[in-house]
């Protein structure tokens, strides 16, 4: 309609506007042009100058248009003209407020506005009228009349009529009042609609809400549009309107609006539970919407949203965003009406990132389309930013307004569930105020203001306090506004009263208290479980409130009153929400949804509060009362356990100086250290974000305070050992704390972390608290420590900011910590203390340089309180993860600078708040007390009604105890492994739960699962090493509980105790422990007699096996009850022994579990040794041997192998066995022979390798028995009933041994009548031995594949090789055994000692043709040496050496000796031979007699009769004497009749006289014939020759003559020997292979490391530096073997040096089959680093370690760093001179005996049992090596290679020539 004019046209337009001659329409057009082109300041001056003409122009045009509209109707041009006129009207009201204030054109303007406000107008005109009316009313302010006030009160339809002096008023009656006098002639004209509503116009469903929004919006945006000369009047205008609104509308919107809300003097009454309202369902747009029947609820929501708009971040839009396609026909201020105003688009902070719609009050499309805008009431146009900020400032400008806003927000918390989305918006406002930008009223007031307020003591709220007496707060609206409304009366009614009290600073604490109190209403509304959507809304709102609560807990500094209010509110909420539902079958979904979050918040708040302020005992009692009444909630137990985990981590750090996430023992793992070095510490919080369940939003690092302190303990009833209430203030730590007897005897008294000089007297319920007490240098001296002193916490992360994402919040918000005033004040204190901390800061962890640095703001991802708070099913993370998250909430608020105080200063000056001091934050006393109190916060856990939850609590107690035990294990650990730290001063209370546990065992059977957990923990608690011995009261209670458990009828209880109470309990030697021995035996027997699959059978037999030595040690063991099979037993070892061994015997034959069966057999073996060592002669020894012997033929080879090991162990006790019964050692050998014969047929053809290997084990065991038994025992005839019947002449045992060996070599099918040839099992039957004792089967364990194909290379080739060797294994072993017996039986040990088994002589020794000292090629050129192969299995060297001297009657120096060197699979042997018969002095030997040889060993043994062999008379029969001598020296050559070889055999018993006479006649006839033939020849001259004389003796000169002579005597040159006797090719390759063969061992070798650990040694250096041990240790080492001088030792060295660098001596043990060298750490030098390194190399490389530990703590494998040490056998000396054995092995190592993990043995048995166990362990380790070969297998392979490659095939003639004279022409330089 109007176009823009240039600047030159402004003056012309001004003249035309003021020209009265122009018509009013023209003047209006020019005036509009001026409005568009002139600045506001110039316009105001223009309007003030020409106000009368301007109003005239407006009014005339308005009247004209009004008449035109009535006549012509509504069309577009007229509507546009109306817009222009109203635009002018608006400008008049805006530019002339001062005149309007004085009622300028009062009636005219009022009449015009009434026409616009007429209810018959269109919505657009009515909205415009409201806007212009509010402008006029703001200008009039207090000069308005009652009518204007009443019109304002009626602008929003739907409210009740306003009471006035005229009576009830509505907008209609105010616009067209009925005439007061019916007959009056003069009355106002009737006001009609200016622009009536057209049909089809969109009308809001809820017009009350719509017009209320319009009114509220225009109250704001019109407030600053009046151009007052005095700008302050803008504020006054809004305040005037707002006062009217509060007076007329507020009582209806908020009937319960109270004037008592006052954040300056808050009323903090805790709200009560409210019943749920009745909800009405409405379906709108196919969506169900819920509402209530509460009047004006929708309007109430609109008003609250309007208030919220001023305090949330608003979305400002530019003007162009509100135009549509450039159509801007209405004034901008009209266009912003926006019908969708209800749909506020406030950015949601707690939703999913999208806007939240209030679906209950949607009023879309209420205006014409062109008036719709994209904005909402929360989306404000940019030009209105200032006015919204102005109103916000006004609402926070006075105390009255501040209280009013907080009361409105309180009302929002009271909304029903269907409107709770508005409550969440209010929560967002508080969140912003509390956590981000504090409003002015939350700033701290000045001190003088505070003092003034305290003096004033105002009684009423300052919210309209002066209206309190005159205004009614009921539903009826009344007005006391008179017709002459004056400024004074307005002031008296609160319009401007607030100006008197503009000091709005109330401080944050009061605001927080009010918020806490009001926000509780969200929880205290009865949830609507019937409507899931409403329930979900309430849950979300509750969680949003809890998030703020938790942020307050974590991030804000609160005073004691605020903390107490928070705790009381949380208690009230928890009690109300979590109360049991009346109907137990109905689930309380609301409580379930909040349970975990609420419980966690409550407990954490309690912890944080106690770190910051003093919390009274009454509050603690309430806390205990509430939580102990809610133990039926599983979520409570879950959160309690999680928080206890975190508190335990803090306890570990602050009291014990241990980080649970970085334990010293974990750090000792090299692999973990590498991993940690690769990580950056800055990423640690991310782990919490990913998997954490902590609710922390704090970024502070853990304080590193580890200084122990003295302090009070917790005060929580129901916890085990809780202290009595103390009414006196705790004395300072510099004073000596005195303990009164009255305190110490109370069951509730317990100070479990005390550093003092004397031990505190304790009762039975508190004696379990473990502690160490060290005396100070003087009484009362301040405790100080040189280590673990913390300076300050690293703050580099604490002040960081990060993105925090909540599940309730869809957006990401950047949180930044800002220093509070308290922080700034603390900085000064810190600077003063800086000097004291400087010394510590130099040695503290990184980050201590940021003690007070709050400027580091690196952005970090921060773990939320709970990334998955709404998912209670998520599993609890591992310790490390939980601790990493828990570190946040366990820190203090940002002002927690007191943690920076040195603990030493704490001791001297103060203590924590919880202990009565002033220190805030985590300190040793606060950590311990809070840990204690939170532990007991569930009350007596045995009062929990739910068995499931009871079991869960006790299950967690076990986990918690395990953490405490882990802390204990990590105290005083050497991190560098170079030195051992001193013992810790404080240790965790590992017996703290005892009273709970003891009581739990007495509960009814429905609590069975919890009882089992209690028993499990009791066993774990009492099988640990006890740092402090329990007192007698505790032990009595403990023994009673254990007795009742062990004698319980419940099998599960028995199983639990037996499974968890290891033999370590017996090793502890607690006073009176032996009284439980009988109970344990009985209980173990009952466990073993059950058929339950889950029964702890192995553990039961381990317990029984550990007790086998006890009856002999404790001569009379008291029993608490009689044992079965023995009546009325009270004491006595024999009865216990008999009962125990019967159980072992039974289970050694019937036990179905493989491992348990092995343990039973080992236990029997240990017991047999014990009885033999003690010479007890127990009759059941034979029964035990019977069981072991029968087990040898058991199908399960693992079990059978254990029995074989036990038999091999008994070899060393053969003399004791012989003393026990003479025939028993022979019986052992017989058992082995018969078992081999029994198993051989099946093993030969078995495809299972273990079958063959077991036969090998039996053969080697038989060999050991043969070598140990005396020859007389082996030659003793086998006496059995069967043999006596079949064979009257019984063969000796040795014969049967050779027979079975022959069967092994040649095959079991060699003899058809095997039973007649070898011993059978039936032959063993006797009264003492039953070879057919029945054995129950066992469940075979699956064979473990230890090696992959990648480890073995070509698996196919390996398997083929293993198969080939397996076939040959039994024959090869049997050949070795026979060779060993032939060579060593009766000879071993030789005079050189057991270290020398095979010959050290080679072909170069005593060889006159060789000059070198080593075997070299020169040897092969010797004419006196020849090498042969015999039977393709043995190498034989014949060497002729010079004679050493005269032997018998030989001529001195004329003869030589013959040396035979034999190499076979069993070893290398050398025999020297001398000529026994030869020429005497001057005489030859008789005709036809060849020289013979006497064979002796290398050491030239000679026998007595041999010396006189040639000194007899001439007529003596020398042959007769020779035969006699052979029978004397080699009794094995005697005939079975035992007659001497020179004695005639007896007459055959079956020959009669006639037969004898016939034989004599035949012999005589033959003799006569021979004589006749001789005579006939003598008489015949043809056969007569000349007689020849005896030739003279010739001395042999050939260098190989005597060797050839011996070969000839042995028959080696004969044709029948030719195929088995060959020469060897002499060449360099043969030389190398001979050297290699000679370097191989001829016995099984083992090297064992032995360590000694003294008390207090836990590091490598200390252990390796030990040069001697205790006497018991030295005796043990001496019993392992015998000391050998390494410089001269000829046996196995195990890598030790002869030069003394590895020690001078070492223990050495050997039999004819085994050599063991012990690398003893105390025998090796440790005088230098190089020596230590060499010592560690030798000891560490051994596969088996023996550790003798006298330390008070268990040995850790990692102390000696090595990749070897597959098996560690640790010996712990006990108080009763017995020894507890633990065996740790890698999992792939198979079972071995005779000792087992948990065995307890006496000192007499220890060395032999340890030695045997080490040998078996070494064998078990070696069997894992692929293709491992025993020594004889290796020798056999080498011999086979030599024979195949170097055997020379030649004709007999060539062979004879080489034998006659070894040819020197054979080249050894390079021939093959």
UniProtKB/Swiss-Prot annotation:
GO cellular component, one term: plasma membrane
Localization per record: Cytoplasm
Phosphothreonine PTM sites in chain numbering: 715
Compositionally biased tracts (Basic and acidic residues): 445-469, 796-810
Gene3D superfamilies hit by this protein: Rap/Ran-GAP
Major place of residence: cytoplasm
Residue list for modification Phosphoserine: 373, 376, 379, 486, 696, 819-820, 1592
Membrane-spanning segments: none
Biased composition (Polar residues): 758-768, 775-795, 840-849
Keyword Endoplasmic reticulum: no
Entry's Gene Ontology molecular function annotations: GTPase activator activity; protein heterodimerization activity
Domain spans labelled Rap-GAP: 1634-1842
Keyword Flavoprotein: no
GO biological process: activation of GTPase activity; Ral protein signal transduction; regulation of exocyst localization; regulation of protein localization; regulation of small GTPase mediated signal transduction
Keywords annotated in UniProt: Cytoplasm, GTPase activation, Phosphoprotein
Tissue-by-tissue expression: Abundantly expressed in testis, pancreas, lung, thymus, brown fat, and white fat.
Region (Disordered) location: 350-370, 445-481, 711-730, 758-813, 831-851
Function description: Catalytic subunit of the heterodimeric RalGAP2 complex which acts as a GTPase activator for the Ras-like small GTPases RALA and RALB.
Record text on subunit structure and interactions: Component of the heterodimeric RalGAP2 complex with RALGAPB. Heterodimerization is required for activity.
Name of the protein described by the UniProt record: Ral GTPase-activating protein subunit alpha-2
Source species of the chain: Mus musculus
Classification lineage: Eukaryota, Metazoa, Chordata, Craniata, Vertebrata
